[in-house]
UniProtKB/Swiss-Prot annotation:
Domain notes: The RxxxRR motif forms an adapter helix that bridges the nucleosome and ubiquitin.
Protein name, as recorded: Histone-lysine N-methyltransferase, H3 lysine-4 specific
Compartments (UniProt record): Nucleus; Chromosome
Gene Ontology biological-process entries: ascospore formation; cellular response to stress; cellular response to xenobiotic stimulus; meiotic DNA double-strand break formation; methylation; negative regulation of transcription by RNA polymerase II; positive regulation of synaptonemal complex assembly; positive regulation of transcription by RNA polymerase II
UniProt family annotation: Belongs to the class V-like SAM-binding methyltransferase superfamily.
Chief location category: nucleus
UniProt domain Post-SET: residue ranges: 1095-1111
Organism from which the protein derives: Candida glabrata (strain ATCC 2001 / BCRC 20586 / JCM 3761 / NBRC 0622 / NRRL Y-65 / CBS 138) (Yeast)
Comp. bias (Basic and acidic residues): 241-252, 897-920
CDD domains hit by this protein: RRM_scSet1p_like (cd12302)
Length: 1111
């Protein structure tokens, strides 16, 4: 084996020279001519070998290749000939004098044919071997071994050439065509000793130097590395190269044994001959390394990705498994881009805190090595691990996508076959139910006003009830057609159309072809419609189709040739262009010109005239308003008359159009008595107190003093002066007339005031719309009060008149019987009044703190509350002192939010509650919108699950459980107004929506009975046993969710349904009606009625239709 060193010849810049370490030859390489010369020393046979090679194009075949062998000596009686190359084949052979010699298969062998030449011909390329029966054919078999000498026969006999080194024969593929793998990569071109295979030039040749310039101790002819024994150890030594020495095979060289004297005779070779390839030690990657950097990415993929257990493995488990080998920089999982199904293919990329690529590559290598030695098993599933080299990730991904596409096609075919079989079964069922579909020619009488003689499609009630169909199913299936209404009747379903054509179109397209899922038969059933056309008679109006939104059918115009088509198209285009041109001319030219000519600045005379007219109109309006402003009389005896009297004759008022447009809204007419209640801003003082209630103001006005009335009159006089200042001047006659009226009214008012001052203020007349009592009504006058206390009687006597009436009612003083009071009657009356005041104050305190008085049965007679013994308080009495017990039918806000403003009196809280109730309009819209969003998200989630089921072809329990968990609503538990704890909704829930699942321990019926007795014995007051069927019971007493806190109510808001999920029965709570936020959820327990009265449980729901007992 020769080891070559490279140096440069300064004379030829395009040449590089290699020299072998044994010095028997040199190798020149010229990149310009692609010529390879080997000049060797004469060997034992005296041959000199010259090789010339020129590559040609064409499917990997070598053309124009010539091998010649010239000998220095000559020998007689030896056949002379020429070897010419032929095409490649898997079995190579020599042809010599009609004798075929077959050689073993080798990838680098060429088939030769030998032709004997005439001795008279002179061929410069003739071959005259030195030996008549032996020649060397050089090559390698599939195991890399060299072939030895081959015997070439001289006769027509046939023999097989056998290798002296290896007798094995293998099928070896052809060597692939050489390509430039790493081309134009910056990571490679920046290397110091990179050779560009395209340009055939060393990129950094100008920067290179001879080794003698770098290290002068190195010899100029080169050096070789030899192994010598130094101090009993074999070491590698660098020595100067000797070109005259012959090279030796290192496998044949031996090294003397340095062991004991008994084993000195044995010699050992420098190294053993390897029979198979071994791994090259991993070399650290640096700036001098060739090729791409080592891979830091690991590809993880499942062995069997169609396994159903793979869906249960989360990505975090795989990520955590490979995290133990090093720090992760990136983790990604891949899925099918078409079906979105997981490929169970993952990419793990490592990094290192130091940023060195060798450390990251080492971590990836260790991950692959450990997974190859021990199988990578994660949660019971096996995975394969490979380094991401040569686009390994893309190859695996493409293979898996193709496999998945084939599987989805198979699933689709199976589904189509199942659908066809279901259609056949439904057709058979349809034949059996032929008697069900009886044609109905007319619409029932109660529906005729609604249908209004329009076409309809009919489905019989018997068919619907047998198949278990609903009207909402038809709405969703026929939404593509223009249906007017969907009606449900005792006779069946009616689908109304506005147009007969639409009804016939739906009938032809869907009748017998539309399929729906039957809830009773558990199969798809075809739907057959019956068309009911509108009736016509000579007595009724002829039916006319209701105009629809659909456009009329356009007749198809056919043209004979291309010219007619072009003419018609050009005609339509010209018409459209003409229309658009006219509209543009109107918009851009005519319109602006008209507006410019009609501007007011072009007609100044008309503008001035219009302004003058408007000024005259304003003057007339002000004059009329001044004439209508008249003085008003103020007479206290005409207050009620002024309020009730109306003008006898309504005077007509004719206004012009402009006045009618500018007419202001009329003010409400007030009686003159209300002038006393008005407070002027310009008056410094007011004679009346301002109150919110008008009746109170009226009462206060009657009790005002005469001095206040004088002040009021002064104020009115001042106001009249102000009105005179801004009013128009009147004539002398009008002034005299008004002066006389004012003088008379003033005299009358003074006289009446003097008369009224002699009467008690309480009995003066009041200026109110309706009569008002002098004293407030007494509470004992109510029909619901039977007894009258002493204090009520004292309050009833207001004046002397009442005392006289009392004397008339009671008997005479002689007939009265009095007990012996011993002079303590007044004390007793005082004591009774004091006790009454104390009870009234305690009642007021209870109302202020509790908003309700305590039940009297809670207090024992003549015994203090502290001295009373412990006793059980019934649930009915708890509502008197527990606030949450009183709000049975109101939403209970159980979610506590910290708010300091809530720490206030109950009166303020009640006011805020009323304000919140008034402002629920926008909140309800927000709740509806949020619920609508939830339903939309649930529908999208359901569609995704159905798509995944259709793609995989299997329905796993995991999908059903995820679907069930997705649909549940947010609920919580808190203290209940019915009993103990209760379940409450945190957000609005619509009717027929799922609320929560009743979760617990699944047990048998005998075990449930035993546990129930045990719970009663241990003192557990509430047991949460829910029966599914005769044999199965759900026990949520100790192992269950919060659904067990839901209470019973005779008017429930929810209901319990038993559904199947994955072959198992489950209990799910659904809403019966719309439920508000923070409202308690209830459902009917439906206990069996007990005959024994002692075992019956009282119901505490408090509903209007409460049964009174649970069982």
């Amino acid at each position: 084996m020769s080891q070559y060193r490279r140096y440069f010849d300064e004379s030829d810049p395009n040449q590089s020279r290699y020299s072998s370490r044994n010095g028997n030859g040199s190798y020149y390489q010229s990149r310009g001519s692609q010529r390879y010369n080997y000049e060797g020393q004469p060997d034992e046979s005296g041959y000199r070998k010259d090789y010339q090679k020129s590559l040609g194009a064409g499917n990997g075949q070598y053309n124009n290749r010539q091998y010649s062998r010239n000998d220095n000596g000559s020998s007689n009686n030896v056949p002379q000939g020429r070897y010419t190359p032929t095409e490649y084949s898997s079995r190579r052979s020599f042809h010599h004098n009609d004798a075929e010699i077959k050689l073993p298969s080798a990838p680098s062998r060429v088939q030769y044919s030998y032709k004997a030449r005439n001795s008279e011909t002179k061929d410069p390329n003739a071959y005259r071997p030195n030996h008549t029966d032996q020649s060397y054919i050089r090559g390698r078999n599939s195991n890399g071994k060299s072939y030895g000498p081959v015997n070439i026969p001289t006769g027509p006999q046939q023999s097989r050439i056998v290798s002296n080194r290896n007798h094995n024969q293998h099928n070896v593929s052809l060597r692939p065509k050489a390509t430039v793998k790493y081309k134009n990569i910056e990571q490679l071109t920046c290397k110091y000793h990179y050779f560009d295979p395209v340009e055939k030039v060393l990129t950094h040749r100008t920067e290179m130097k001879k080794w003698t310039e770098v290290n002068k101790d190195m010899p100029e002819v080169g050096f070789v590395v030899q192994q010598e024994t130094i101090n009993g150890q074999v070491k590698s030594v660098i020595k100067s190269r000797k070109p005259d020495e012959k090279s030796t095979d290192p496998r044949k060289t031996t090294i003397p044994n340095t062991g004991n004297s008994s084993t000195k005779k044995k010699q050992r070779t420098a190294r053993k001959c390897r029979k198979e390839l071994t791994l090259v030690p991993r070399i650290s990657y640096d700036k001098f390394s060739l090729g791409p950097p080592p891979s830091t990415e690991v590809v993880v993929f499942a062995e069997n990705f169609s396994n159903t257990q793979m869906a249960n493995i989360p990505d975090i488990s795989i990520k955590n498994y490979f995290r133990k080998f090093g720090e992760l920089a990136h983790f990604a999982s891949y899925s099918d881009p078409k079906t979105a199904l997981p490929l169970h293919l993952y990419l793990v990329k490592y990094t290192h805190p130091s940023g060195k690529i060798n450390d990251s590559a080492k971590a990836a290598y260790q991950a692959v090595k450990s997974c190859q030695e021990q199988k990578c098993c994660i949660l019971g599933c096996n995975f394969n691990v490979l380094l991401n080299k040569n686009n390994e990730l893309e190859n695996i991904m493409n293979k898996r996508i193709t496999v998945l596409s084939k599987e989805t096609e198979k699933v689709k075919l199976q589904m189509e076959q199942e659908k066809k079989s279901a259609l056949k079964k439904s057709a058979e069922l349809n034949k059996e139910e032929k008697g069900i579909l009886k044609p109905l020619k007319t619409i029932p009488g109660d529906l005729r006003p609604i249908v209004n003689n329009r076409p309809a499609l009919y489905i019989s009630r018997r068919f619907i009830s047998v198949m278990g169909l609903r009207l909402i199913d038809f709405k969703s299936k026929l939404k593509a057609y223009k249906c007017s209404r969907f009606l449900e009747h005792a006779t069946g379903f009616y689908i109304i159309f506005n147009n007969l054509e639409h009804a016939k179109l739906c009938m032809d397209a869907e009748s017998g072809k539309l399929t729906m899922a039957s809830r009773r038969k558990r199969t798809t059933v075809p739907i057959n419609f019956i068309l009911i056309e509108p009736f016509t008679s000579r007595f009724s109006k002829k039916y006319k189709d209701v105009p629809s939104d659909s456009k009329e059918k356009v007749e198809i115009v056919r043209y004979n040739n291309k010219e007619e088509l072009i003419d018609a198209a050009s005609k339509y285009i010209i018409e459209d262009l003409a229309k658009t041109l006219h509209t543009e001319i109107r918009k851009t030219m005519i319109g602006p010109a008209v507006f410019d000519t009609l501007q007011p600045s072009n007609f100044p005379q008309l503008v001035q005239k219009r302004k003058e007219q408007e000024e005259l109109k304003k003057a007339d309006m002000e004059k009329k308003k001044a004439e209508q402003a008249k003085s008003k009389d103020f007479n206290i005896f005409n207050l009620y008359a002024s309020y009730t009297n109306k003008p006898k004759r309504r005077q007509k008022r004719y206004l012009s159009d402009e006045e009618a447009e500018e007419e202001l809204p009329q003010k409400k007419i007030k009686p003159l008595a209300h002038l006393l209640d008005e407070v002027r801003e310009d008056s410094p003082t007011s004679g009346l107190e301002s109150t919110d209630d008008p009746t109170e103001g009226d009462n206060m006005s009657t009790s005002s003093s005469s001095e206040d009335e004088d002040d009021i009159m002064d104020d009115f006089q001042n106001e009249d002066k102000k009105d005179d200042m801004f009013s128009t001047p009147e004539t002398n006659e009008e002034m005299d007339y008004h002066h006389k009226i004012d003088y008379r009214t003033e005299n009358l008012i003074d006289k009446e005031i003097d008369d009224a001052s002699q009467v008690n203020e309480r009995y003066l007349p009041s200026a109110t719309q309706f009569p008002v009592t002098v004293y407030p009504e007494n509470t004992y006058d109510s029909e619901y009060i039977d007894t009258v206390s002493l204090f009520d009687l004292q309050d009833a006597i207001k004046d002397e008149e009442d005392m006289e009436f009392l004397k008339e009612c009671l008997p005479a003083g002689e007939d009265l019987e009095f007990d012996d009071d011993n002079g303590l009657l007044e004390y007793r009356i005082w004591k009774i009044k004091q006790m009454a005041d104390i009870s009234q104050s305690s009642t007021n305190n209870e109302l202020r703190l509790n908003n309700q008085t305590l039940d009297k049965t809670l207090f024992e007679k003549n015994i203090p509350f502290i001295a009373s013994e412990f006793k059980h308080i019934p649930e009915k009495l708890k509502s008197s002192y527990l606030p949450h017990k009183r709000r049975v039918h109101e939403p209970l806000n159980t979610v506590s939010h910290h708010n300091e403003s809530k720490e206030q009196s109950p009166d303020i809280a009640i006011k805020e509650k009323s304000v919140n109730k008034a402002d629920t309009g926008e909140g309800s819209l927000a709740e509806i919108s949020s619920s609508r969003d939830n339903r939309a998200s649930n529908r999208r989630f359901q569609q995704n699950i159905e798509a995944q089921k259709a793609a995989t072809g299997t329905e796993s329990e995991l999908l059903s459980l995820n679907q069930l968990n997705k649909r549940k609503k947010p609920v919580t538990f808190a203290r209940s107004a019915i009993h103990n704890w209760g379940l409450y909704a945190l957000e609005p829930i619509n009717a027929k929506e799922m609320v929560i699942e009743y979760v617990g321990e699944r047990i048998r019926q005998p075990v449930a009975e035993m546990r129930e007795r045990r719970y009663i014995k241990n003192g557990i007051g509430s047991s949460y046993l829910f029966r599914i069927d005769e044999h199965t019971v759900i026990d949520a007493t100790k192992k269950g969710g919060i659904a067990r806190f839901i209470n019973h109510c005779c008017e429930p808001s929810c209901t319990a349904k038993i559904i199947k999920v994955g072959g198992k029965r489950r209990i799910v709570i659904y809403a019966l009606r719309d439920i508000a936020a923070n409202e308690e959820l209830t459902y009917d327990y439906k206990f069996e009625r007990e005959t024994d009265a002692e075992e019956r449980l009282p119901c505490l729901c408090g509903a209007p239709s409460c049964k009174g007992f649970l069982n």
